[in-house]
Amino acid sequence: MKFFVDTADVKEIRELNDLGLVDGVTTNPSLILKSGRDIIEVTKEICNIVKGPVSAEVAATEYEQMMKEAAVIAKIADNICIKLPVTLDGLKACKALSSDGHKVNMTLCFSANQALLAAKAGATFISPFIGRLDDTGINGMELIAEIRTIYDNYDYRTEILAASVRTVNHVKEAALIGADVVTAPPATLKALVKHPLTDKGLETFLADWAKTGQKIA
């Protein structure tokens, strides 16, 4: 499974990248707002830090303007991935951009039907929103499972990018079901390493080691 970090915070991205935990980055208009930076400037900096795909989202909702904004975003770096909403105009733009060799991340996916259309349009990634579905009382993981089955049935190459991930359990369940990628906030990715028994065991080992009076280096 690949891990993408869902943030536009360059400091956080650099830290996780140095740990070897980042395969890519996803951003959206809300994260750009939170960063307080210019979208082109911050996205270019992120692309220089991370070797994998960096998703940057268009703000337009109509095809013609989507294509204009996509052209600007595509020039930022070779590892850029153009993010589009799963709408009719978005699917049309996806088909045009993917046919031209661009990576495309179709976002705001809440149904298996939307994921099927995105795959047919040539999307590189489909981003089903787990947490937001959970908020409505629907199990977001069921959507991941449905998409996995459909893509396997027809050998679609579009990768399932589990998004709106809020907990370490979301990450585990997405991995068990077979999502290709999980994108999560920095805090969630860091929390994956934590377990109380690990902390307790380390505390015991360190206390016992101190009693030996030895040094390794």
From Swiss-Prot:
Its EC number is 2.2.1.2. GO terms for molecular function: aldehyde-lyase activity; transaldolase activity. Keywords: Cytoplasm, Pentose shunt, Schiff base, Transferase. Gene3D superfamilies: Aldolase class I. This is Probable transaldolase. One of its GO terms (cellular component) is cytoplasm. It is found in: Cytoplasm. The keyword Cytoplasm applies. The active site is at K83 (schiff-base intermediate with substrate). It comes from Brucella anthropi (strain ATCC 49188 / DSM 6882 / CCUG 24695 / JCM 21032 / LMG 3331 / NBRC 15819 / NCTC 12168 / Alc 37) (Ochrobactrum anthropi). HAMAP family: Transaldolase_3b (MF_00494). The gene is tal. One of its GO terms (biological process) is carbohydrate metabolic process. The keyword Transferase applies. NCBIfam families: fsa_talC_mipB. It catalyses: D-sedoheptulose 7-phosphate + D-glyceraldehyde 3-phosphate = D-erythrose 4-phosphate + beta-D-fructose 6-phosphate. Signal peptide: none annotated. Belongs to the transaldolase family. Type 3B subfamily. Transaldolase is important for the balance of metabolites in the pentose-phosphate pathway.
